[in-house]
Amino acid sequence: MATFKDACYYYKRINKLNHAVLKLGVNDTWRPSPPTKYKGWCLDCCQHTDLTYCRGCTMYHVCQWCSQYGRCFLDDEPHLLRMRTFKNEITKDDLKNLIDMYSTLFPMNQKIVCKFINNTKQHKCRNECMTQWYNHLLMPITLQSLSIELDGDVYYVFGYYDNMNSVNQTPFSFTNLIDMYDKLLLDDVNFVRMSFLPTSLQQEYAIRYFSKSRFISEQRKCVNDSHFSINVLENLHNPSFKVQITRNCSELLLGWNEACKLVKNVSAYFDMLKTSRIEFYSVSTRCRIFTQHKLKMASKLIKPNYITSNHRTSATEVHNCKWCSVNNSYTVWNDFRVKKIYDNIFSFLRALVKSNVNIGHRSSQEKIYEYVEDVLNVCDNEKWKTSIMKVFNCLEPVELDNVKYVLFNHEINWDVINVLVQSIGKVPQILTLKNVITIIQSIIYEWFDIRYMRNTPMVTFTIDKLRRLHTELKTAEYDSGISDVE
């Protein structure tokens, strides 16, 4: 059983404040939610289990039980998860406030310990001090956290997470902030707490404390498309699709890292809860992560043979050709922007190949086919440029004054002509590697200009950012039919 979950369940009964703060969905009546196979730690109850997506940020970080409350670490309501979440620069005073909050919500003294032990011993089979019956008393105060970086902002969700070596498929990584505080001070806090426990439980408490307070922080993970709800990924092919999210809000006037101080003033905390409400937002999916997801899907469906073919139709309109026909049944082609990019890039590449007749040899064709498969994945800049360079070298360019040139005198479609005029200023007859890179980038940037895209989607924004963008009518940034250039 999760130690943090058990502690919340038992300590919830000791006073009115705890009853309000320590209420977890996992300790209440179970309500079904979409089951998934994503493994990790629920940020709400800290247990390692199967996770489902959060309605506040669409990432997988909540268990099927806790999802009924819809709590997100990005909320603006002072629930327990939000008060345990710290952001960016954390000071020693911030950590002291966190420790004080733990001490307030999970007090350890002779009266509390005796009360829990007496309640447990009412059952005949629980006369001995076995750890499974006193799990709630064995939660030490640590500075163990799960951290994540979202567009430059780093969030730390503190808690007590068991089984740190278990499978973690979430974008959160374990971070230990004890060095930012003081090991001896934290040791003293826990030794005092431990002194109230029966001797038979003290050893287990000490083992848990040192294992969770002396570990080495993990390397921070990169957020990718697999960390977001499958429901969102399945609808990315619709250019006008907007993600519906809900956030728990209140009139929280304190700084982000000061929310945990609210438990020191009970009346102020309950006054704050009276202002609680749910806010709904409909936000755009435009970001580098989701753009890369779409371009990668299209890359898997590439038919490189088209660049040496004589088809009169665009690349996605070829039918009944074993080597060049694209499988249009995939939903990625429902996004007309991806289709446009694919058609224009392959129109340009075919013109390059046809203009350089030496490419006609079969061995050269087979080489260029391998390199063409990565020409859409512009989000991975190094890999993409390497792919373009290898395609260029397959054209057997001529070198003059240390600059390599290839011919360009084959027909192209009107869309590519417009791109050439906009990016180079004319329709050239010879091209350098730099020209080729610029042209292909321009074809992609016309619809997905990743230079000006944030990395993660708007669903990972804080409430104040969402409100500001909503006021400026920027949460839904563009409708279908409008490109980034327009």
Swiss-Prot record:
Compartments where located: Host cytoplasm, Host cytoskeleton
Intrachain S-S bonds: none
Keyword Metal-binding: yes
Processing after translation: The C-terminal region is phosphorylated by host CKII/CSNK2A1. Phosphorylation of the DSGXS motif is essential for host NF-kappa-B inhibition.
Span(s) of short sequence motif pLxIS motif: 480-483
Record-level Gene Ontology MF annotations: metal ion binding; RNA binding
Stretches for region RNA-binding: 1-81
GO cellular component, one term: host cytoskeleton
Pfam families in UniProt: Rota_NS53 (PF00981)
Region (Important for cytoskeleton localization): 82-176
Residue numbers spanned by region Interaction with host IRF3: 317-486
Principal location listed in the UniProt entry: host cell
Intervals of motif IKBKB-like degron (ILD) motif: 479-483
Region Zinc-binding domain: start-end pairs: 42-79
Keywords, sorted A to Z: Host cytoplasm, Host cytoskeleton, Host-virus interaction, Inhibition of host innate immune response by virus, Inhibition of host IRF3 by virus, Inhibition of host IRF7 by virus, Inhibition of host NF-kappa-B by virus, Inhibition of host RLR pathway by virus, Interferon antiviral system evasion, Metal-binding, Phosphoprotein, RNA-binding, Viral immunoevasion
InterPro entries tied to this protein: Rotavirus_NSP1 (IPR002148)
Highest taxon above the source species: Viruses
GO BP, one annotated term: symbiont-mediated suppression of host cytoplasmic pattern recognition receptor signaling pathway via inhibition of IRF3 activity
Membership in a protein family: Belongs to the rotavirus NSP1 family.
Binding partners and assembly: Interacts (via C-terminus) with host IRF3; this interaction leads to IRF3 degradation. Interacts with host IRF7; this interaction leads to IRF7 degradation. Interacts with host CUL1 and CUL3. Interacts with host BTRC.
HAMAP family: ROTA_NSP1 (MF_04088)
Notes on the domains: The integrity of the zinc-binding domain in NSP1 is important for degradation of host IRF3. The pLxIS motif targets host IRF3 for degradation; however phosphorylation of NSP1 pLxIS motif is not required for its activity.
Purpose of the protein: Plays a role in the inhibition of host innate immunity by inducing the degradation of key host factors required to activate interferon production such as IRF3, IRF5 or IRF7. Associates with components of cullin RING ligases (CRLs) including CUL1 or CUL3, which are essential multisubunit ubiquitination complexes, to modulate their activities. Recognizes the host NF-kappa-B regulator BTRC through the presence of a DSGXS motif in the C-terminal substrate recognition domain.
Protein's name according to its UniProt entry: Non-structural protein 1
Species, as recorded: Rotavirus A (strain RVA/Human/United States/Wa/1974/G1P1A[8]) (RV-A)
